[in-house]
Amino acid sequence: MADFIRTQIFGTCFEITSRYVDLNPVGMGAFGLVCSARDQLTNQNVAIKKIMKPFSTPVLAKRTYRELKLLKHLRHENLITLSDIFISPLEDIYFVTELLGTDLHRLLTSRPLEHQFIQYFLYQILRGLKYVHSAGVVHRDLKPSNILINENCDLKICDFGLARIQDPQMTGYVSTRYYRAPEIMLTWQKYDVEVDIWSAGCIFAEMLRGKPLFPGKDHVHQFSIITELLGNPPDDVIETIGSENTLNFVKSLPKRERIPLSQKFPNADPDAVDLLEKMLVFDPRKRINAADALAHPYLAPYHEPSDEPVASEKFDWSFNDADLPVDTWKVMMYSEILDFHNVDSSAVEQQQQQPQPPQPQLQQQQQPPQQPQQPQQPQXAQQPVQPVQGDYVPQVAPRS
């Protein structure tokens, strides 16, 4: 049986196996506290997320089970990877994943991003979403703080605690307001993978302008400022509104015409504006999907269809409608953890034997490039709890 060590972090007891040392707080994720640590077995830095009181209610137990199942199933270069999981003697659950140096929120609040970084980050976000959506999963909470980045500009989407089945009748109040798709505000029930594309579009716009595009104070103000830019929703979208109060609110809005995004982003690459126009569309049925967005001319320097994989099978959501007691969820959780430890070593071995796909060239330099045609790059963070800093000057190059 593994030895456990107790440490107090921000007044919270972290009870982890002795394999992990040098704990430092990173921040709060969805329903959990995250710390960085060093894995003595691999000598790699990792992130450890404590799921607080996972068995206190059936709802929390089910949510934790869902996140574990998703982390086990979703394996992609642009998604956070689960490397270990354990239940402590106090019956808290800990997810161990790779540690990246910073997140997109920290980068955006530190300085403007240069064009090639915006382009490469958006490509990786959409590459990850293409895979997630192909598995029948909707992230539902895509935002800059859920997009992790290392010093080599490798990007990974994290925090699948709110992810749900790909289902047009999903319900609930989800996603951070600034990045929330209008169909969520209009109906709160009928939405699908397109909500992630809207969120990615809002993130794309924020990278281009350096601040949120739709900083709503509440959901009414949020929807109002969306219409100030995109105009009133078309009639066929209004017809889908299920709530009478929401319908009356939308009809009461003043008549507004769509403003071309080229006016909002006068200095942006025309291809970037064109792609953004296709992502920020009121009607989710007409919104571009992840696969088509990857093929857009704006992302041509990185687009490689053979290196943009989809899931080999759909995620099994058969448990999602189950209404089970905590003890049953606990047994199911233990079963999943045992299964993870039984199969993970063979999966890693198999992955190591497979040839790695070609990656965009990212070079570590101590000084900016000397060629005049290559602009100086922003430095990426090396520490997860510090503002963006360090000696890295990554050079982003198109695929050869």
From Swiss-Prot:
<keyword id="KW-0418">Kinase</keyword>
<dbReference type="GO" id="GO:0005634">
    <property type="term" value="C:nucleus"/>
</dbReference>
<dbReference type="GO" id="GO:0004707">
    <property type="term" value="F:MAP kinase activity"/>
</dbReference>
<keyword id="KW-0963">Cytoplasm</keyword>
<dbReference type="GO" id="GO:0051403">
    <property type="term" value="P:stress-activated MAPK cascade"/>
</dbReference>
<feature type="region of interest" description="Disordered">
    <location>
        <begin position="345"/>
        <end position="400"/>
    </location>
</feature>
<dbReference type="GO" id="GO:0106310">
    <property type="term" value="F:protein serine kinase activity"/>
</dbReference>
<dbReference type="InterPro" id="IPR003527">
    <property type="entry name" value="MAP_kinase_CS"/>
</dbReference>
<dbReference type="InterPro" id="IPR000719">
    <property type="entry name" value="Prot_kinase_dom"/>
</dbReference>
<keyword id="KW-0723">Serine/threonine-protein kinase</keyword>
<dbReference type="Pfam" id="PF00069">
    <property type="entry name" value="Pkinase"/>
</dbReference>
<keyword id="KW-0804">Transcription</keyword>
<dbReference type="InterPro" id="IPR008352">
    <property type="entry name" value="MAPK_p38-like"/>
</dbReference>
<feature type="binding site">
    <location>
        <position position="49"/>
    </location>
    <ligand>
        <name>ATP</name>
    </ligand>
</feature>
<dbReference type="InterPro" id="IPR038783">
    <property type="entry name" value="MAPK_Sty1/Hog1"/>
</dbReference>
<keyword id="KW-0539">Nucleus</keyword>
<feature type="active site" description="Proton acceptor">
    <location>
        <position position="141"/>
    </location>
</feature>
<dbReference type="GO" id="GO:0005737">
    <property type="term" value="C:cytoplasm"/>
</dbReference>
<feature type="modified residue" description="Phosphothreonine">
    <location>
        <position position="171"/>
    </location>
</feature>
<keyword id="KW-0547">Nucleotide-binding</keyword>
<dbReference type="GO" id="GO:0005524">
    <property type="term" value="F:ATP binding"/>
</dbReference>
<dbReference type="InterPro" id="IPR017441">
    <property type="entry name" value="Protein_kinase_ATP_BS"/>
</dbReference>
<keyword id="KW-0597">Phosphoprotein</keyword>
<feature type="short sequence motif" description="TXY">
    <location>
        <begin position="171"/>
        <end position="173"/>
    </location>
</feature>
<dbReference type="InterPro" id="IPR011009">
    <property type="entry name" value="Kinase-like_dom_sf"/>
</dbReference>
<comment type="function">
    <text>Proline-directed serine/threonine-protein kinase involved in a signal transduction pathway that is activated by changes in the osmolarity of the extracellular environment. Controls osmotic regulation of transcription of target genes.</text>
</comment>
<keyword id="KW-0067">ATP-binding</keyword>
<dbReference type="InterPro" id="IPR008271">
    <property type="entry name" value="Ser/Thr_kinase_AS"/>
</dbReference>
<feature type="modified residue" description="Phosphotyrosine">
    <location>
        <position position="173"/>
    </location>
</feature>
<feature type="binding site">
    <location>
        <begin position="26"/>
        <end position="34"/>
    </location>
    <ligand>
        <name>ATP</name>
    </ligand>
</feature>
<comment type="similarity">
    <text>Belongs to the protein kinase superfamily. Ser/Thr protein kinase family. MAP kinase subfamily. HOG1 sub-subfamily.</text>
</comment>
<keyword id="KW-0808">Transferase</keyword>
<dbReference type="InterPro" id="IPR050117">
    <property type="entry name" value="MAP_kinase"/>
</dbReference>
<keyword id="KW-0805">Transcription regulation</keyword>
<feature type="domain" description="Protein kinase">
    <location>
        <begin position="20"/>
        <end position="299"/>
    </location>
</feature>
<feature type="compositionally biased region" description="Low complexity">
    <location>
        <begin position="361"/>
        <end position="389"/>
    </location>
</feature>
<protein>
    <recommendedName>
        <fullName>Mitogen-activated protein kinase hog1</fullName>
        <ecNumber>2.7.11.24</ecNumber>
    </recommendedName>
</protein>
<keyword id="KW-0010">Activator</keyword>
